[in-house]
C-alpha cells in the first residue's frame, strides 16, 4: 500500500494549489483563445435559436389555423346549401352497376295487436331545408328484399337492364364532412323497425292507494292462457294474458286482489313511468251495463297489478269477471334470445308458463367489408308525466368493421319533420357515447347498462365532434373506427299528438382507398293511441320500398382535398427528463432544491477502478442556472452514475484535476448543484464562502451519511474506517465516529484548522449509507488538494455525457469536452444550439491577437504546470 511520506503545511499546500490552478486556467484560457471560440459564434448560436424559435412559432400558428379549419361551421362557403348527399364528390365513378340492397322490416302501432299501420317509404330525407338536391342518377342493379311477418314471398329481383332510379337522399344540409372519391357507391339501405308499441290507457283514477283489504283468498282465477309464447320483441312482438276470476265471498268497496308478473315480462312495454311514481293506470273492469266494477293499476317496480273493487260490489254476490292484458319483454332481465320462465301469480295462484323471445339481431348493415352498419331502438317513452321524454339506444358499427371517415346522424324524424313529434337539438337531446370492449356481449334487446364493465364511456372525447347544425338532427363525427360504439339518447318530443318517428344513419368510406362510399339507415316509430286498454301494436306491415341510392354526379369531378385532421395543440417544451442511471455501485439519495434560471441535464458516467465500494444512489432534483466556466482535466475512473436534473446558478471558476471516486451530493441554492460520485484527487477552485484546504490520503472504504449545509459549514456525521492522511484548513464541524483498524476510535466534535498527518495502516471494511441532504446557499471558495493514494487505484477515464445550459461570461461559449466521443441526443432545440459546435462566423482578422495571446497563456500555463509537477516530485522524494 502506498503511503504519503511527506505532507506540506496548510499554507504551502494552499499556495501550491493556487499556483497549480493558475497554471491550469492559463492553459485552458490560452487554448480557448487559440482556437478562436469568440463572440460571433455565440451570436450565431443565438441567431440560430431565434430562427428555430420563429419556425416553431410559425408551426404553432399553422396548427391553430388547421384547428380552425377542422371545426365545421355553417354558412362558411357558398356550397353550404347543398345536401350531405350532394357532397359525395363522386370523382372516378365506377361504370359498373352496383346492387341495390334494401331491407325493410315492420312498423308497429300502440293499438291492440289487431291494428296495423302502413309506414311511409323509408327514404332518408330532410324537408326542413329550403335548398333542393340536384337530381342525379346512377345505373344500379335492383336487388330488393322485403321481410315481414305477413308476406313470405321475399323475392330477389335482378334485371340485366340498367334501372336508373333517382333516389332523393336528403340528409341534413351543409354536412360538416365531405366524402371523396365515391367509387362503387352503395345504394342507401334503410331498415324500418318500430319499437314495441306503447301500452297506454286512458287516464283513470289510480288504484295504488287501495285502503281496503287484500281479498286474494276470496278470488279464484281460471281459464288462464297466453295468446302466444314466442315472438320477436324487436319487431313489436308481444303477447296477451287472459283469465277469468270469481269472487267466492262477500267483498266491499276498497277491497282488492293482485296479479304479479315474473322477471322476464313487463306490463308497461316501452312506456316509461319513472316520472309518474312508477305507476301505470290500467283500463277499468266494467260490467255489461258499463258500470265500473274495479279499477286497476300496475306497479312498474314490483310488476304487480292491483284491482280495487268499487261500491258496485257492495251487497252483491257471485261476482265474476275477466280481464285481458298485454305483456311485453323485460329488455333488462331478458337481454338475449331464448326461453324464459313466465310464471304468473293471480290472486296467490301460480300459473306456470314458458316464453320464448326471438330477438331480431341488432347487428345489421351493408353486406361488404367496409359497409355501413347501424341499428337503433326506442326503449322508453314517457307518455304520462307531461315531460314528453324518450330514450333510444343506437349501436354504431356493431359488425366491428374497419371504417373510415365515419359519420352518424340521429334524426327526430324520418321523411318529413312535420310528420314526427320528435325533437333533436342541443337543448332537447342528451347523448352519451360508450366504447364496447366485447361486441359479442351486446344485448339482443338493445338494453345497455351504463355501469356495465363491457362499456367504457368516451363521451368527453366527442365534445367537439357533436353538431346540431341542421334542424332536428344530431351529427356525430366518429372518424376512422374499428370498434363498436353504443349511443344512449335521451330526447324529447312535442305534444302535437303525432307519432314519434326517429331515424339513424351511418355513412363511411373505405379507410385505405378513401373511396367506396357506404350509407345505411334505420327507422323507429312509436304510435301512441289512447283507448280502452293497452296493447303492443307489433303487427307486420309492408313498407314501401325506399327509393334508390345517393345521387352521384356522372361527370368526374376533381378529387377534393382530404379533410384536414386537427393538428395537436402546440405543447410547451417538456421538462428535461433525467437519463436513467446505468446502475452505479453507489446508492445515495439527495432531494435538494435550488433556484435557477436555467436547466442543465447532466448525464455522466464514470468508471472507477478503485477499492472503494460506494453504493450510492443520488437523485438530485435541483434547479440552478450555471453561469460558470469550468475546466475539468480529470483522470478519474469512477463507476458512478449521476443523473442531475438540475439548474444551477453558479458563478464559479472551478478547475479540477481529479483522480477520484467521490459520492457526493450538494444542493446549492446558490451557485452550484453538483451531484458526483467520485474518489477525488481534486484541485478545485470554486468561488464560495468556505475555504477548505485539505490534503487527505485515504485508503478507505467508506460510505458517508452526511447532512451538510454548505454555507460552508458542513456537519458531517460519518462512520469511516480510514487509512487517511488529511490536512484540513477548513471551517468544519465534524461529528465523526471513525472506527479504524489502526487502533483509533475517535468520536470527536471538533472545529479545527488542523494539520494532521496520520500514517496509519487500517483495514477499513465499512458500510455506510449516505443519505445526505445538503442545502448550500453559499458563496464558497474551496481550494482543496486531496490526494488519495489509497488501495483504490483510480486510474480512471471519466466519461461525461452531459446536456447543460451554460452561459459563459462575456458571451463566450465553450464546446463541452467529451473524452469518449459519446453523443447525447437531446430533443430540445435550445439545448442543441447551445451544445453543438458551430462554424466560425467571425472575422479571422479579429482573432489574430487573440491567437497570439492564447498561445502565450497556454505556454505560461504549461510552465506553471511543469513547475508544480517538479515541486511535487521533490516533495515525494
Swiss-Prot record:
It is found in: Secreted, Cell wall. Its main location: secreted. One of its GO terms (biological process) is cell adhesion. Residues 44-192, 530-849 are annotated as: Disordered. Residues 556-801 have a biased composition (Acidic residues). Pfam families: Big_8, Gram_pos_anchor, SdrG_C_C, YSIRK_signal. Proteolytically cleaved by aureolysin (aur). This cleavage leads to the inactivation of ClfB. Residues 842-877 form a propeptide. Residues 45-542 are annotated as: Ligand binding A region. The record marks 197-200 as: Cleavage. It comes from the Bacteria. InterPro entries: Adhesin_Fg-bd_dom_2 (IPR011266), Adhesion_dom_sf (IPR008966), Fibrogen-bd_dom1 (IPR011252), LPXTG_anchor (IPR019931), SDr-like (IPR050972), SDR_Ig (IPR041171), YSIRK_signal_dom (IPR005877). Residues 833-846 have a biased composition (Basic and acidic residues). Cell surface-associated protein implicated in virulence by promoting bacterial attachment to both alpha- and beta-chains of human fibrinogen and inducing the formation of bacterial clumps. Belongs to the serine-aspartate repeat-containing protein (SDr) family. NCBIfam families: LPXTG_anchor, MSCRAMM_ClfB, YSIRK_signal. The Asp/Ser-rich domain functions as a stalk to allow the ligand binding domain to be displayed in a functional form on the cell surface. This is Clumping factor B. It comes from Staphylococcus aureus (strain N315).
Amino acid at each position: 500500500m502506498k503511503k504519503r511520506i511527506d505532507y506540506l503545511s496548510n499554507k504551502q499546500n494552499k499556495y501550491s494549489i493556487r499556483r497549480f490552478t493558475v497554471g491550469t486556467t492559463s492553459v485552458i484560457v490560452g487554448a480557448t483563445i487559440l482556437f478562436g471560440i469568440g463572440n460571433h459564434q455565440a451570436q450565431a448560436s443565438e441567431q440560430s435559436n431565434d430562427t428555430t424559435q420563429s419556425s416553431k412559432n410559425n408551426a404553432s400558428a399553422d396548427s391553430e389555423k388547421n384547428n380552425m379549419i377542422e371545426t365545421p361551421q355553417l354558412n362558411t362557403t357558398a356550397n353550404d346549401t347543398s345536401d350531405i348527399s350532394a357532397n359525395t364528390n363522386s370523382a372516378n365513378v365506377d361504370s359498373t352497376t352496383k346492387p341495390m340492397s334494401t331491407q325493410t322490416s315492420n312498423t308497429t302501432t300502440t293499438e291492440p295487436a289487431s291494428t296495423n299501420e302502413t309506414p311511409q317509404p323509408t327514404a332518408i330525407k330532410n324537408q326542413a331545408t329550403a335548398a333542393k338536391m340536384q337530381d342525379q342518377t346512377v345505373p344500379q342493379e335492383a336487388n330488393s328484399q322485403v321481410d315481414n311477418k305477413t308476406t313470405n314471398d321475399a323475392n330477389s329481383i335482378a334485371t340485366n337492364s340498367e334501372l336508373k332510379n333517382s333516389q332523393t337522399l336528403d340528409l341534413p344540409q351543409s354536412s360538416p364532412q365531405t366524402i371523396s372519391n365515391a367509387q362503387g357507391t352503395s345504394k342507401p339501405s334503410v331498415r324500418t323497425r318500430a319499437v314495441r308499441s306503447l301500452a297506454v290507457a286512458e287516464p283513470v283514477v289510480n288504484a295504488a292507494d287501495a285502503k281496503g283489504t287484500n281479498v286474494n283468498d276470496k278470488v279464484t282465477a281460471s281459464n288462464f292462457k297466453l295468446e302466444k309464447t314466442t315472438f320477436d320483441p324487436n319487431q313489436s312482438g308481444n303477447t296477451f294474458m287472459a283469465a277469468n276470476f270469481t269472487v267466492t265471498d262477500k267483498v266491499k268497496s276498497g277491497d282488492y286482489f293482485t296479479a304479479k308478473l315474473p322477471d322476464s315480462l313487463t306490463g308497461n312495454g316501452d312506456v316509461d313511468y319513472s316520472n309518474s311514481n312508477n305507476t301505470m293506470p290500467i283500463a277499468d273492469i266494467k260490467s255489461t251495463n258499463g258500470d265500473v266494477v274495479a279499477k286497476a293499476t300496475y306497479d312498474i317496480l314490483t310488476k304487480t297489478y292491483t284491482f280495487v273493487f268499487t261500491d258496485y260490489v257492495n251487497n252483491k254476490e257471485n261476482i265474476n269477471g275477466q280481464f285481458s292484458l298485454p305483456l311485453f319483454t323485460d329488455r333488462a332481465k331478458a337481454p338475449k334470445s331464448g326461453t324464459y320462465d313466465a310464471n304468473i301469480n293471480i290472486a296467490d295462484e301460480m300459473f306456470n308458463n314458458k316464453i320464448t323471445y326471438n330477438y331480431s339481431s341488432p347487428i345489421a348493415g351493408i353486406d361488404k367489408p367496409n359497409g355501413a352498419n347501424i341499428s337503433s331502438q326506442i326503449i322508453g317513452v314517457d307518455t304520462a308525466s307531461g315531460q314528453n321524454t324518450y330514450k333510444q339506444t343506437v349501436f354504431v358499427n356493431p359488425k366491428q368493421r374497419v371504417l373510415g371517415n365515419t359519420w352518424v346522424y340521429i334524426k327526430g324524424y324520418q321523411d318529413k319533420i312535420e310528420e314526427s313529434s320528435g325533437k333533436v337539438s342541443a337543448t332537447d337531446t342528451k347523448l352519451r357515447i360508450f366504447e364496447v370492449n366485447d361486441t359479442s356481449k351486446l344485448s339482443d334487446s338493445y338494453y345497455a347498462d351504463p355501469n356495465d364493465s363491457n362499456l367504457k364511456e368516451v363521451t368527453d372525447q366527442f365534445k367537439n365532434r357533436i353538431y346540431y347544425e341542421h334542424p332536428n338532427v344530431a351529427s356525430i363525427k366518429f372518424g376512422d373506427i374499428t370498434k363498436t360504439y353504443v349511443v344512449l339518447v335521451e330526447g324529447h318530443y312535442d305534444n302535437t299528438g303525432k307519432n314519434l318517428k326517429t331515424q339513424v344513419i351511418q355513412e363511411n368510406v373505405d379507410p385505405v382507398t378513401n373511396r367506396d362510399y357506404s350509407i345505411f339507415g334505420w327507422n323507429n316509430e312509436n304510435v301512441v293511441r289512447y283507448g280502452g286498454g293497452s296493447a303492443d301494436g307489433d303487427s307486420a306491415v309492408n313498407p314501401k320500398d325506399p327509393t334508390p341510392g345517393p345521387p352521384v354526379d356522372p361527370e368526374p369531378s376533381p378529387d377534393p382535398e382530404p379533410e384536414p385532421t386537427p393538428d395537436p395543440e402546440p405543447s410547451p417544451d417538456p421538462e428535461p427528463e433525467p437519463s436513467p442511471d446505468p446502475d452505479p455501485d453507489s446508492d445515495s439519495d439527495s432531494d435538494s432544491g435550488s433556484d435557477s434560471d436555467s436547466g442543465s441535464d447532466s448525464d455522466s458516467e464514470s468508471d472507477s477502478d478503485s477499492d472503494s465500494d460506494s453504493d450510492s444512489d443520488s437523485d438530485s432534483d435541483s434547479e440552478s442556472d450555471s453561469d460558470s466556466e469550468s475546466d475539468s482535466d480529470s483522470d478519474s475512473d469512477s463507476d458512478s452514475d449521476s443523473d442531475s436534473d438540475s439548474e444551477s446558478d453558479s458563478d464559479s471558476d472551478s478547475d479540477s484535476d481529479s483522480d477520484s471516486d467521490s459520492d457526493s451530493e450538494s444542493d446549492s441554492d446558490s451557485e452550484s448543484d453538483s451531484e458526483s460520485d467520485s474518489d477525488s484527487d481534486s484541485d478545485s477552485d470554486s468561488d464560495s464562502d468556505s475555504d477548505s484546504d485539505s490534503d487527505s490520503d485515504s485508503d478507505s472504504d467508506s460510505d458517508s451519511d452526511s447532512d451538510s449545509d454548505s454555507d460552508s459549514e458542513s456537519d458531517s456525521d460519518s462512520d469511516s474506517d480510514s487509512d487517511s492522511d488529511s490536512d484540513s484548513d477548513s471551517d468544519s464541524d465534524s461529528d465523526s465516529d471513525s472506527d479504524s483498524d489502526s487502533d483509533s476510535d475517535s468520536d470527536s466534535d471538533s472545529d479545527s484548522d488542523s494539520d494532521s498527518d496520520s500514517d496509519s495502516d487500517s483495514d477499513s471494511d465499512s458500510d455506510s449509507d449516505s443519505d445526505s441532504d445538503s442545502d448550500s446557499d453559499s458563496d464558497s471558495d474551496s481550494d482543496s488538494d486531496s490526494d488519495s493514494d489509497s488501495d483504490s487505484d483510480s486510474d480512471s477515464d471519466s466519461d461525461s455525457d452531459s446536456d447543460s445550459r451554460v452561459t459563459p461570461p462575456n458571451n463566450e461559449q465553450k464546446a463541452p469536452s467529451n473524452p469518449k466521443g459519446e453523443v447525447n441526443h437531446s430533443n430540445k432545440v435550445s439545448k442543441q444550439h447551445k451544445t453543438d459546435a458551430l462554424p466560425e462566423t467571425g472575422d479571422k482578422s479579429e482573432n489574430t491577437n487573440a491567437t497570439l495571446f492564447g498561445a502565450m497563456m497556454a505556454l505560461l500555463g504549461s510552465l506553471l504546470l511543469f513547475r508544480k509537477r517538479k515541486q511535487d516530485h521533490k516533495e515525494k522524494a
